């Protein structure tokens, strides 16, 4: 029997905010959001790419017009050789727009989060910051209580874990054995203001080059702002006394940033032509560099605790990266998270209409629908990530030739930008509800 009223959302990133907004406006539920970090830290991050499948969901959430003022629509992706020549220009907007109404969009993470916060505030959704979750208790199958380190607690009929790849909801309750694994790759990046580009006619393009040391790419992310990153293989740092890999990365950031600058400098020195000149100018204008190691969650993890595990009917579900974080190399992280949100909302509508008799049936259907897509995107991300491996100059030359050849036939085989199939970016999660 449908008995949902209040929803607790753990995490005030894109997944958590989108979930609260959708469940409030479409399902008429009463969400409340709890976030570990303070408001400034909760919005940190670099630039995000969102393909058509994610943009369509964000439009249905009523966010598109707000986002459009803060980001940039990308028209094409341009692949450069290290020698400076253009290997191929690929239109990434026309066909998706014709079929979905949307193309490919880039926006700073902090701006996307602010759009979501503004939308949540318009709907009077409370957001509590600085709340460290310490325990989760499901009571008799009809409610769930969360307790925080400051001694406060809250109870609702549904709990959504939207707290990212290092999810506390997953660690404390849903799947304690599931741990993030390191992909072997990391990236250094920066957002640069007001780069002189008066001679360039491609201010709405994403540019990339594969080098022997990794991949270098850049794209606009806001008015008068450009994002660039250098992604390469990075060994796992030595473990610290705490046993937490994140502590090792913290030390790595402090000690190895100079080595990254040196590696990047050698890459830039080998790049020629106008493209190389522009990238040296862009990197030289960067003030704040950030390093991020890329983690993912192994496939097969649990997204809810089934009643057959000795517990009552479940009231807790993981969404977004908390459930299925993939490497960023498919450009689908935000899109997958908001797809989760739209699907859950639709299933809860069907639950209210009597198509399901228990919340566990809703969770089970959600799981069966999402698993194949997550597996597909995970494989794509892993495959794209391997292009960042260290390699000889001769192998880079061969790959440049191979990509030139493949990009000429991708559209014939139904492929678009960087090997992402049209089926991936034209996917409509709401069609799964029919």
Task: Name each model-derived stretch.
Residues 1-434:
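FAD-dependent flavoprotein oxygenase/oxidase catalytic domain
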């Amino acid at each position: 029997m449908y008995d949902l009223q209040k929803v607790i959302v753990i995490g005030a990133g894109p997944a958590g905010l989108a979930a609260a907004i959708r469940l409030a406006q479409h399902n008429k539920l009463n969400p409340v959001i709890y976030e570990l970090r303070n408001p400034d830290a909760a919005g940190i991050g670099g630039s995000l790419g969102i393909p058509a499948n994610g943009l369509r969901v964000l439009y249905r959430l009523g966010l598109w017009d707000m986002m459009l003022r803060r980001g940039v629509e990308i028209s094409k992706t341009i692949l450069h050789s290290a020698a400076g020549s253009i290997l191929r220009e690929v239109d990434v907007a026309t066909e998706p727009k014709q079929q979905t109404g949307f193309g490919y969009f880039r926006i700073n993470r902090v701006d996307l989060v602010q759009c979501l916060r503004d939308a949540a505030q318009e709907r009077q959704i409370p957001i509590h910051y600085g709340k460290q979750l310490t325990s989760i208790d499901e009571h008799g199958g009809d409610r769930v209580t969360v307790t925080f380190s400051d001694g406060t607690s809250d109870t609702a009929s549904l709990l959504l874990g939207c707290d990212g790849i290092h999810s506390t909801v997953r660690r404390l309750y849903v799947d304690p054995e599931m741990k993030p694994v390191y992909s072997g790759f990391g990236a250094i990046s920066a957002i640069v203001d007001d780069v002189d580009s008066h001679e360039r006619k491609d201010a709405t393009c994403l540019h990339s080059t594969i080098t022997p040391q990794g991949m270098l790419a850049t794209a606009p992310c806001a008015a008068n702002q450009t994002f660039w990153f250098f992604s390469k293989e990075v060994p796992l740092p030595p473990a610290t006394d705490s046993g937490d890999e994140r502590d090792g990365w913290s030390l790595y950031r402090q000690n190895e940033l100079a080595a990254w600058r040196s590696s990047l400098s050698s890459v830039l020195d080998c790049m020629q032509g106008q493209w190389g000149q522009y990238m040296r100018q862009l990197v030289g204008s960067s003030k704040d560099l950030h390093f991020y190691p890329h983690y993912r969650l192994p496939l097969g993890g649990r997204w809810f605790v089934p009643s057959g595990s000795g517990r009552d009917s479940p009231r807790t579900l993981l969404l977004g990266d908390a459930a299925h974080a993939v490497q960023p190399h498919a450009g689908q992280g935000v899109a997958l998270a908001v797809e989760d949100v739209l699907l859950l909302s639709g299933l809860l509508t069907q639950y209210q209409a009597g198509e399901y008799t228990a919340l566990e049936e809703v969770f089970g259907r959600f799981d069966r629908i999402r698993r194949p897509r997550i597996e597909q995107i995970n494989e794509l991300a892993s495959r794209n990530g391997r292009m960042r491996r260290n390699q000889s100059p001769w192998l880079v030359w061969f790959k440049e030739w191979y990509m030139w050849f493949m990009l000429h036939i991708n559209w014939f085989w139904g492929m678009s930008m960087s090997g992402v199939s049209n089926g991936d970016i034209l996917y409509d999660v709401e069609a799964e509800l029919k």
